[in-house]
Amino acid sequence: EDAFVGPSLGAEAINQGYLSMALGLLLVIVFMIGYYGTPGWMANLALFFNVFFIAGVLVQIQAALTLPGIAGIVLTLGMAVDANVLINERIREELHKGKGLLDAINIGYEKALSAILDGNITTVLIGVILIIFGSGSVKGFGVTLCIGLVTSVFTSVYISHILIDWMAKRQIKAG
């Protein structure tokens, strides 16, 4: 039995995908701020940089965003949030051990790095396999997944570190 999805149903599915991504992002923002406070704000800012970088790369390669592409972006944003949770929990552990704020931040990032890289590298490998052996929408999912993972690692490990360091130095300077 063949099924045909017309253009209006496809457009509706894409719009629902955008809506679910926006709603999910809003819930993540609320959680990160509510649970982590100021570091949650910094993680959210890094997440917005991530979305900006993903969109920029997709525009540069002239990729059409499909439902599987949206799913790939949502998955990578989830992994970016996970990376920020790992980092923030490591920082908390170091603060509970009595480390100073800047030391706790640097050690927290250092300790979280291997777990973040392991998870993202293995998922990029899966994305590459999907790109090589997949066709159509599977390949599109793999492309957005790989792009999103690269930008997620960059924003989670580098951009958020800069932002949290900046926030900590302002906090220390303010007394």
Residues covered by each model-derived region:
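Structural signature of multi-pass, alpha-helical inner-membrane proteins
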Residues: 1-22, 171, 175
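Hydrophobic alpha-helical bundle architecture
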Residues: 9, 32-36, 57-68, 73, ...
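Interfacial segments of transmembrane alpha-helices in multi-pass membrane proteins
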Residues: 11-68, 132-137
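Small-residue-enriched core segments of transmembrane alpha-helices in multipass membrane transport
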Residues: 41-62, 73-80, 141-156
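Hydrophobic alpha-helical transmembrane segments of membrane transport and translocation systems
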Residues: 56-57, 93-175
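Membrane-embedded alpha-helices of multi-pass transport/permease systems
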Residues: 81-84, 88-91, 161
